[in-house]
């Protein structure tokens, strides 16, 4: 009896498809970025999510809240022209972008819930938009000259936002408890997949 020279690779649920459509690749990459960021922040208490490095005002909790807002902004306001949903509508903005990253007045449970609920809500919005018009669906927002991005552009912009802040999350999490790694371990369970 012989054994195979290699194991068959079984991708985790957040892995983008090896062979898929453009929409599957974009949504798969977004799913992996969401899962990676969530794993980087997973399992922390209030203090862990509020921890900052001396050179920055960023915290893991602030990144989770900011990206939850980014999801809603891109896929509600920019895509559909609709007002932001709660909890953003009643926060009382201070005319700076800093309020988006504020997590000190929220518990870990509240912060995780805001992020997880935004991911679930916006996954549905993406699925609905793809069913309606695919990646070429024209967004509500324009550049002031009547040029409207397509859903494809909004997804790429959202991926860029995640990529930028997932790098920040690497440094923040390592400073909290030493956790490092590129992707969640295969046995990690995502709260939104």
Residue ranges and their predicted role:
Residues 2-15, 23-97, 138-193:
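Short, contiguous alpha-helical
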Residues 18, 77-78, 105, 116-119, ...:
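Generic alpha-helical secondary structure signal
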Residues 20, 59, 125:
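Extracellular glycan-associated modules
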Residues 96-137, 150-162:
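Acidic/histidine-rich alpha-helical segments that form the ligand environment
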């Amino acid at each position: 009896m012989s054994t195979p020279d290699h194991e068959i690779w079984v991708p985790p649920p957040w892995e983008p498809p090896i062979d898929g459509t453009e929409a599957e690749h974009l949504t798969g990459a977004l799913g992996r970025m969401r899962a990676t960021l969530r794993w980087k922040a997973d399992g922390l208490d209030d203090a862990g999510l509020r921890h900052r490095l001396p050179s920055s005002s960023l915290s893991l909790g602030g990144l989770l809240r900011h990206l939850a807002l980014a999801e809603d902004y891109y896929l509600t306001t920019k895509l559909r022209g609709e007002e932001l949903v709660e909890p953003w509508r009643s926060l009382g903005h201070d005319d700076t972008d800093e309020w988006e990253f504020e997590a000190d007045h929220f518990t870990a449970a509240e912060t995780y819930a805001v992020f997880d609920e935004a991911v679930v809500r916006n996954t549905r919005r993406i699925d609905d938009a793809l069913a309606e018009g695919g990646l070429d669906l024209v967004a509500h927002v324009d550049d002031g000259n009547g040029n409207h991005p397509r859903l494809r552009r909004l997804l790429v912009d959202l991926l860029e936002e995640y990529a930028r802040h997932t790098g920040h999350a690497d440094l923040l999490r390592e400073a909290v408890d030493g956790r490092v790694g590129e992707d969640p371990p295969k046995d990690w369970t995502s709260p939104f997949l």
